[in-house]
Amino acid sequence: YVAGKKELIENCAYRLTSPGLGKEVGASLGVMQSFYQGFFMAPTVVCGALKGAVFAANIYEKIGYSVVPNASESRHDIIQAVTFGSADGVIAFCQGIQAAAPVDSYVTPEPWAMPGYDSEVIMAAGAFVQGSSIELSADGPIKPPYAVYFQGGLTWQHAKLGILKSLQSLIDAGVIDRSKLQSL
């Protein structure tokens, strides 16, 4: 509890929650530990996601696919685009990412007519938190130029596993010939 002058109580409320919201958001009831842990872990998690994006760009560029940004370009977010030029490539990539998921890895994502899109879309995200963009995920519209958008990985190792599983899925689907990987 905090007791004292109104102005001091208000300052405490802003300090313990957020400026401008203060007491209006109510008690935090034990969630502050999770917030602070998130702040503490954020640099490590973002670093892992960025390393995963660079790894994906490097591999897919070396085997002949167009990637944006490329492996050596300056980065301003965690999203990595890979253009496959075919629906089969987008689908196999997303299915490989889903297979590496910590949640629902047994699910096989399929393209579908999602509201708000002008084409079918496929999404892979076996995440702990639905809609989390920092967790390993991939999605893409099933239309030319057939690009997929990869992001996340709570750890570098998980991002790497996702990319390796995506490669295996592309090989299994006949999109990539295994001999292309010899140069890696």
What positions do the PLM features span?
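Generic low-polarity alpha-helical segments
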Residues: 1-2, 148
